[in-house]
Amino acid sequence: MPQAIHISPIDNVVVALHPIAKGTLVEVDGLAVTALEDIPQGHKMAVKPIKNGENVIKYGFPIGHATADAEPGTWMHTHNVHTNLSGEVEYSYNPSPDLAPLPKVEPETFMGFRRKDGRAAIRNEIWIIPTVGCVNDIAKKMVADNQDLVTGTIEGLYTFTHPFGCSQTGHDHAQTRKLLAALVRHPNAAAVLVLSLGCENLTHEQFLAELGDYDHDRVKFLTCQDVDDEFTAARDILKKLAAYAGQFKREPIPVSELVVGMKCGGSDGLSGITANPTIGRFSDMMGQRGGSTVLTEVPEMFGAEGFLMDRCIDRDVFVKAEQMINGFKEYFISHNEVVYDNPSPGNKQGGITTLEDKSCGCVQKGGTAPIMDVIGYGDPVVTKGLNMLYGPGNDLVSATAMTAAGAHLILFSTGRGTPFSAPAPTLKISTNTPLAEKKSGWIDFNTGVIADGEKTIDEAAKDLLDLVIRVAGGEQTKAEKHGFREISIFKDGVVL
């Protein structure tokens, strides 16, 4: 079993695949270094002398600079490494010389649902979407009272509550409206009840305008203040929606029609070595099959955005990526926040030292394929291949944004563990085997086998594709079995 990994030949650190005790001789890639102190799993150890102020190199890229001289064998972390990041950057388009679509592969099929508008779906559910937080508990009771309608091919009745829809203004209000309308359009929802109170800022007329053309059999509306008994009214509506949803049956659909979101949260020092590269290889495999993948978490691209921007398929896509990256930095600056106020305490405990360190691991989920499009918050994926989406690093907010963009399911890598799930089925992918064993009720797929030397990234990615096909065909994720699913909306404005 390997002790450590030397990710790039030019790196001056290695990453411990397992805890390394002080005095242990570590041999990797022709290097032989004795650990001068204990090195926790996922953490970095110097394998070359590093001077004060010299860059610390990992993934072949500077992840910060040393704040003290370090001899080979030194533990390199927050006590002796600091970020190099600052504010906005003027980027130039330097497309990778080998920028080209990956060779095509005949797509496999999964057993999914074909909607009347031609779109594919992997779940056949009825959703209740509240337009305002005031009706959250009403929506929950409607779900509880009508579980008998979940029969036949209907796979669930769910609501996604939130605290917004009123006391919002301007762009913040518009953003909420756009996100909720996007959820109503999601193909996994066979039928939708839009539930409002009646006096909120997000009016029925505004929501209809945002939603645009819709199938009146698939989407129904109920305003609680307009009826004597909202529960009786909801029962009548939900019966009609159930009759509509019950007509859909699973049938073979090519994998090329899948949209898969890619997310990491509770990351550790192995995220960029095991789970995220596996997801990246999966993303490339999806692109070869004509499918679509979505990468977001813009603040966690800071410091590594060059890896992605040089892969933009053309200058127009590059300009959109540049505007997205610098726009998010300006968002931080406008709130008097530093752009590099990341990683989290849990990330640091797991071995991630700086935002560059975290970002270099994060972008591994993007694989090697060209970036085909950059889309805004609440906008749908319309281009096949790898897409970048405007969204924060926050797990709940970014996963909700990917669902709203049309992701049928989400791949979520984690080194620390999390039970969270978006409305779209969310597969938890552990970076290390101890987590998979400890939290077997959370974890769907273990890439710790890569660190254990049992499988290669290519082998793990193929296994992951097989799992995705099964989940798309109806196999439940661990979170689905527990009934976990929720949303969080990107808030950027005052509360009236």
Language model regions located:
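Metallocofactor- and cofactor-centric catalytic cores in central/energy metabolism, strongly enriched
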Residues: 1-409, 416-496
